């Protein structure tokens, strides 16, 4: 391992689901809009404004191209959390006097679940569908859940914790046949897997800049124009972004999102091959060195930049402390301050004990083969050490069912 350290910079970043480093090409494109090209894109009476507006519209076209949309269907927001809130609350407010039922999954991102809980207090009925043990939606369950009161189905493209890819085309087909709007939080899939809003019959889609090597604080929302989808805005003001999201647009951030989208679109195949190769290398080497390691979520129907692994017989928190040279997560960054086991892992039927042992490893554009090999060796040596110290691991090896043990207080 000492030999490996010579050309490595520690700690190694492996938390690509929580955020990504900004691509140098993105930063280079943004810089002029912080300095000389500082105009307000809404100022129509001089060249500074025209220049900024032109940059914003170019970025809008780049974002639209990635998902096969029209640029007029893209509005800029501060990120996917705002986009999700605008969809769920905005659509319920606009159509709520006609339909009062929304369907989502128990494994959605916290911002979707909490927006839905907010609506429940306002009289909207929410159905939280269970998922199968591989993390994928059961389409028959979805069909049976839709009623004549159903307004919206909200299902994310790629799960942020376990990386599974939901069958968007099939979901979209069901929604279109039943005359229900289909929203997808595509933040973890945008620019990483092919998503075409027309082929998938997606009516609304949430996008984040910092998940695709772009800047933080910028995102987008795709809103279908034909057939037209309406939302009531969350923010009132000057009526920017087709009246749906008022406020002066942050030109440098939008330029960054546009360039990041263009790079992701042009290099998707290359990035996918790179990530898939490193995923297989990491997983195969881990399995060859230590036992009782479980991949959470479907192995094939997933974005392979996400490796969520459970290591039986040890605590996730102790693993993170032991492998401090790796920047990893024990769950969604939005909830990792909590010592509760991941609600996503619990929703796929994983026991509380095993859920507590899970670590999410993220692989991305800038991850190297050398980093993967170092990570594998570090993880395996530390897991082996922690297991040798663990009485629980010893009991498991002796065939003791930990669930049946009755612990007594002293």
Curated annotation (Swiss-Prot):
Keywords: 2Fe-2S, Cytoplasm, Iron, Iron-sulfur, Metal-binding, Pyridoxal phosphate, Transferase. Master enzyme that delivers sulfur to a number of partners involved in Fe-S cluster assembly, tRNA modification or cofactor biosynthesis. Catalyzes the removal of elemental sulfur atoms from cysteine to produce alanine. Functions as a sulfur delivery protein for Fe-S cluster synthesis onto IscU, an Fe-S scaffold assembly protein, as well as other S acceptor proteins. This is Cysteine desulfurase IscS. Its cofactor is pyridoxal 5'-phosphate. Homodimer. Forms a heterotetramer with IscU, interacts with other sulfur acceptors. [2Fe-2S] cluster binds at residue 334. The active site is at 334 (cysteine persulfide intermediate). The gene is iscS. Pathway: Cofactor biosynthesis; iron-sulfur cluster biosynthesis. One of its GO terms (cellular component) is L-cysteine desulfurase complex. It is found in: Cytoplasm. Gene3D superfamilies: Aspartate Aminotransferase, domain 1, Type I PLP-dependent aspartate aminotransferase-like (Major domain). It comes from the Bacteria. It holds the Pfam family Aminotran_5. Pyridoxal 5'-phosphate binds at residues 80-81, 160, 188, 208-210, 248. Its main location: cytoplasm. It is an enzyme of class 2 (transferase). One of its GO terms (biological process) is [2Fe-2S] cluster assembly. It comes from Rickettsia prowazekii (strain Madrid E). Belongs to the class-V pyridoxal-phosphate-dependent aminotransferase family. NifS/IscS subfamily. The modification N6-(pyridoxal phosphate)lysine is found at residue 211. It catalyses: (sulfur carrier)-H + L-cysteine = (sulfur carrier)-SH + L-alanine. GO terms for molecular function: 2 iron, 2 sulfur cluster binding; cysteine desulfurase activity; metal ion binding; pyridoxal phosphate binding. Its EC number is 2.8.1.7.
């Amino acid at each position: 391992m000492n030999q490996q350290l010579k050309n490595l910079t520690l700690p190694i970043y492996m938390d690509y689901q929580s955020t990504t480093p900004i691509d140098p090409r993105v930063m280079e494109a943004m810089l002029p809009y912080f300095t000389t090209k500082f105009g307000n894109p809404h100022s129509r009476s001089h060249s500074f404004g025209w220049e900024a507006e032109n940059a914003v519209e170019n970025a809008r076209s780049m974002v639209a191209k990635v998902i096969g949309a029209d640029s007029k269907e893209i509005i800029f927001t501060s990120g996917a959390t705002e986009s999700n809130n605008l969809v769920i609350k905005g659509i319920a407010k606009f159509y709520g006097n006609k339909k009062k039922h929304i369907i989502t999954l128990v494994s959605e991102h916290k911002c979707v679940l909490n927006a839905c809980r907010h609506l429940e207090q306002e009289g909207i009925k929410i159905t939280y569908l269970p998922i199968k043990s591989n993390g994928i939606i059961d389409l028959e369950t979805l069909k049976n859940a839709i009623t004549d009161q159903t307004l919206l189905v909200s299902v994310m493209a790629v799960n942020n914790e376990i990386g599974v890819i939901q069958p968007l085309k099939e979901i979209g087909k069901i929604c279109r046949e039943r005359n229900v709007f289909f929203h997808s939080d595509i933040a973890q899939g945008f620019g990483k897997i092919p998503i075409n809003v027309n082929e998938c019959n997606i009516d609304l889609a949430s996008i984040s800049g910092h998940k695709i090597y772009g800047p933080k604080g910028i995102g987008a929302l795709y809103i279908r124009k034909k057939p037209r989808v309406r939302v009531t805005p969350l923010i009132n003001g000057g009526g920017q972004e087709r009246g749906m999201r008022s406020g002066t647009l942050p030109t440098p951030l939008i330029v960054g999102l546009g360039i990041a989208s263009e790079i992701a679109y042009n290099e998707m195949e290359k990035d996918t091959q790179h990530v898939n190769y490193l995923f297989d290398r990491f997983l195969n080497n881990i399995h060859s060195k230590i036992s009782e390691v479980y991949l959470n979520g479907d192995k094939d129907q997933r974005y392979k930049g996400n490796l969520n692994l459970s290591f039986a017989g040890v605590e996730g928190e102790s693993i993170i402390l032991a492998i401090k040279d790796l920047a990893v997560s024990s769950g969604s960054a939005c909830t990792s301050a909590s010592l509760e086991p991941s609600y996503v892992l619990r929703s796929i039927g994983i026991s509380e004990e095993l859920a507590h042992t899970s670590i999410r490893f993220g692989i991305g554009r800038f991850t190297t083969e050398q980093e993967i090999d170092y990570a594998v060796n570090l993880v395996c040596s530390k897991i082996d050490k922690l297991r040798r110290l663990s009485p629980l691991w010893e009991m498991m090896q002796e065939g003791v069912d930990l669930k049946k043990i009755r612990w007594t207080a002293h």
